């Protein structure tokens, strides 16, 4: 394949399609409702959403489409076949399509067929099968492949290279059907040292040849809020800071990601240079967005704008309905997250109790994920829902969110009032305000005021929907 020889490349970026093949839903029932209630995805409409996206992308006439992972609901083979078939329409129109896997896409124990109140396993796929299914979308002889992962490097023009990074840990997924203790799909991202070196070598060579290099990956490389690597670690690739530094040194200054279903642009300033991360929301759930970017390699910049999927052929009010589904899922998502991570939560509580035995004698922490969920929802549901929606929509800094920050802090105070007994209650609240609330406020401000590198001399706000980004 010959590369294009022009300096300007128009591209579309889509992420987190989460397509569910219609045949996986044999009969409606409690099993599928349980799955829907703990999520914000519009799974019934997922194939129609992709069909509509394909039409909209064709209307834009890009030369390149990037898909940053989670192509399927849960790695079902039949879902992958449908996604590849739809994306092939773009390829047939002369558009290059490049994909990378997300944490849902391969070797997934949650691949299920829904039959009324029950489920049965659906066929999932292996890593070689992923490369075979998407062979015309990055995994052919025109790409240079990492021998150990699904990462690859692709020259798009004489001046532009795409570094496609596989950050998934599906090799560690467990299956009861294979003798494991539980079904578990790893959400986190990781890159082995050898793969990191391969990526750095590819980027270094492309930069030395005079090409601009843009990366794509499912997991985040740059935090989208203060302490994301601690508070939402599964959404960031392990060792993100060091990897980011190495990629910047190799000449990479822009990366497209997905995973968290948000429209947000984050930036970090290192001694070696700047890295800008463009996270694209999921069209399959609110805010139902994707991106158009025009790269001018001669000028060394990229112009970016967001696109919104407002309607479907079957639903003219699709985006608004998706927003209501998003809001309604907060309680069940809270229950689901606490239940899923309950072993880790109890381990952290026990460690804290062992270190602060005297204080913890006066603290009544609920002993089940359900009880903790109800406590948090009682005092925090409304402000957390609004904060989450504001974060997902992007451009949070465009409105005054101080009142929302105050509501969140008051909600935490009420949780303390209900869990701390006796004389320690005012002391505990005072300690929280002194030691923890400063950090808590930084986290909230970084989200609700859209601040990058908060608290540093590089603190800045970037327009999440219309931006000019240096390459």
Can you say where each PLM-predicted feature lies in the sequence?
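N-terminal active-site segment of His-dependent metallophosphoesterases
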Residues: 1-80
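Divalent metal-coordination and catalytic microenvironments
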Residues: 15-16, 65, 70, 83, ...
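His/acidic metal-ligating clusters that form di-metal
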Residues: 57-64, 96, 161-163, 178-276, ...
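Non-catalytic terminal accessory segments
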Residues: 1-9, 314-471
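Extended active-site neighborhood of metal-dependent phosphoesterases/phosphodiesterases
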Residues: 82-197, 271, 292
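Acidic/histidine-rich helix-loop elements
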Residues: 18-48, 75, 116, 171-191, ...
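Active-site environment of divalent metal-dependent phosphoester hydrolases
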Residues: 20-23, 73-76, 103-111, 170-173, ...
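Beta-strand-turn-beta hairpins that frame and shape the catalytic cleft
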Residues: 2-12, 23, 149-164, 169-181, ...
């Amino acid at each position: 394949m010959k590369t294009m020889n022009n300096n300007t490349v128009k591209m579309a970026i889509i992420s987190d399609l989460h397509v569910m093949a219609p045949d996986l839903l044999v009969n409606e029932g409690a099993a599928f409702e349980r799955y829907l209630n703990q999520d914000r995805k519009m799974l019934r409409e997922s194939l129609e959403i992709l069909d509509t996206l394909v039409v909209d992308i064709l209307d834009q006439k890009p030369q390149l489409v990037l898909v940053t992972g989670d192509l399927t609901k849960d790695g079902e083979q039949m879902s992958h076949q449908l996604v590849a078939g739809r994306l092939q329409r773009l390829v047939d129109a002369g558009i290059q399509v490049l994909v990378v896997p997300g944490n849902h896409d391969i070797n997934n124990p949650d691949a299920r067929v829904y039959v009324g109140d029950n489920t049965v396993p659906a066929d999932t796929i292996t890593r070689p099968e992923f490369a075979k299914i998407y062979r015309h979308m990055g995994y052919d002889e025109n790409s240079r492949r990492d021998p150990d992962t699904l990462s690859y490097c692709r020259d798009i023009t004489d001046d532009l290279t795409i570094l496609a990074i596989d950050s998934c840990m599906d090799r560690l997924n467990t299956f009861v059907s294979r003798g494991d203790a539980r079904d578990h799909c790893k959400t986190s991202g990781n890159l082995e040292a050898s793969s990191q070196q391969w990526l750095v070598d590819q980027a270094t060579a492309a930069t030395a040849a005079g090409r601009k290099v843009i990366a794509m990956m499912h997991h985040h490389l740059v935090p989208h809020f203060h302490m994301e690597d601690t508070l939402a670690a599964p959404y960031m690739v392990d060792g993100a800071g060091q990897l980011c530094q190495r990629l910047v040194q190799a000449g990479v200054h822009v990366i497209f990601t997905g995973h968290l279903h948000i429209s947000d642009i984050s930036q970090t300033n290192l001694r070696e240079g700047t890295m800008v991360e463009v996270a694209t929301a999921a069209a399959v759930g609110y805010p139902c967005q994707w991106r158009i970017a025009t790269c001018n390699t001669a000028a060394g910049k990229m112009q970016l704008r967001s696109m919104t999927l407002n309607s479907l052929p079957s639903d003219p009010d699709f985006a608004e309905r998706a927003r209501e589904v998003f809001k309604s899922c907060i309680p069940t998502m809270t229950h689901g997250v606490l239940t899923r991570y309950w072993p880790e939560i109890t381990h952290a509580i026990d460690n804290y109790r062992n270190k602060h035995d005297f204080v913890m004698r006066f603290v009544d922490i609920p002993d089940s994920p359900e009880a903790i969920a109800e406590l948090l929802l009682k005092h925090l549901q409304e402000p957390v829902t609004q904060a989450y929606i504001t974060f997902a929509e992007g451009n949070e800094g465009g409105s005054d969110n101080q009142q929302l920050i105050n509501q969140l802090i008051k909600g935490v105070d009420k949780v303390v009032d209900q869990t701390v007994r006796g004389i320690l209650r005012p002391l505990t609240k005072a300690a929280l305000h002194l030691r923890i609330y400063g950090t808590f406020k930084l986290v909230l401000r970084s989200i609700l005021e859209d601040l990058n590198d908060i608290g540093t001399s590089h603190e800045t706000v970037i327009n999440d929907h219309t931006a000019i980004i240096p390459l």
